Amino acid sequence: AREACNPYYDALPAIVQEYMDKVNKKIGTNYALFNYHGAQDAEHVIVAMGSVNETIEETIDYMVEKTGAKVGLIKVRLYRPFATDAFLKAIPKTVKTISVLDRTKEPGSIGEPLYLDVVAALSDSEFKNVTVLSGRYGLGSKDTTPAQIVAVYNNKDKKRFTIGINDDVTHLSLEVGPAIVTTPAGTVNCKFWGLGADGTVGANKNSIKIIGDNTDKYAQAYFDYDSKKSGGVTMSHLRFGDKPIKSTYLIKRANFVACHNPSYMTKFNMVQELVDGGTFLLNCTWSKDEVEKHIPGQVKKYMAEHNIKFYIINGVKIGIETGMGPTRINTILQSAFFTLTGIIPKEQANKLMKDAAEKTYGRKGEDVVKKNWAAIDAGANAFEEVEVKKEWASCADEGLEFKTKTEGRKDILDFVNNVQNYISAQEGNNLPVSAFTSYVDGSTPIG
């Protein structure tokens, strides 16, 4: 009986393709068991499946446009049963190297599942002499970025590798260059640092709806925070553009960064994620003359060297004056964001925000709605530009404010100072594998 089902598995790929063709005819797509994207004369092709394909596509378009790179991607639409003939037809005849990306780790195996399937499919084909490399990505929900994909295409020698992890123990990781902006021209990348329960996430969800519903722009939002959201750090990643957005990763290079909590200035690297000429908005109670002494040296240095436009706004004061209260600054900062970015004309943005506020808070009464309207009006004009002085370029790096633990058991001291502090500073993804050699069994010290 186990073997009697073979004809059904053999027939399945053709059936799936038949239904894909029906979908394609209905909505104008081109779904196939394996889709190819990239240069027609590609010499290095990635094989992958899942959301990473969007990032790879975006990177290919960037590389082909900038350098004429001969790179491509085969997207696996149907994994099981693996249709070998359809896969081979999707491969460019010019290919010399294939890198297979698996989002899994199979300890003890000679390779991950998709890699082994590709090797088997090629073994009796015209591509049997093509070099096949095996890579792992996305382990532990690590972001896969365009810079990492470029590293995959640049790799010609490392037969087994990982991306997104700095492996200084078994040395499987690829050398990754600096973050690059591969989004289509005209795409605006924005990042907001908020405090859990201050309304920042909710305001940004409203911003996405406003832009998506009232303009012709494509919109995308990711919200990054842990399960203990209230009182913790929240990060909102917003993208807007005139072309489809394929960026399935968090923003590393932003046009606009907003810090809604001034204490974050010494705790996190925020400004350093801005592109040259980007805009930084800081919510604080300091005046234009006072703010300089509260900004760490490395932040001032970066702003001076990269021509950053620096603005401050006193959301606490405005919140009190409009009756919103000192902690509900979300609407105020949202209004300032729309004015500073100009994504929507100021008057239109003002009206749309007020309509959204009425829809959101209408059930709480007219008084609450009017307070939100007042906050929107105030936030649109209350920010001030701070001069970024040339001499800031010579400021020293003061580092992040870590709470170093000095007393207690050695295992606890090591974990707090070498792992936990970096995770708290949102730098955990940069920790090397060697930082975890004492915790390979998954345990953490208790105390």
Question: How would you describe each model-predicted region?
Answer:
Residues 1-102, 107, 112-203, 334-335, ...:
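Flexible, low-complexity linker and terminal segments
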Residues 58-68, 88-92, 115-117, 205-213, ...:
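Short, solvent-exposed amphipathic alpha-helical segments in soluble enzyme
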Residues 112-117, 135-148, 294-360:
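Short alpha-helices
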Residues 349, 364-447:
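Ferredoxin-type iron-sulfur electron-transfer modules and their immediate structural context
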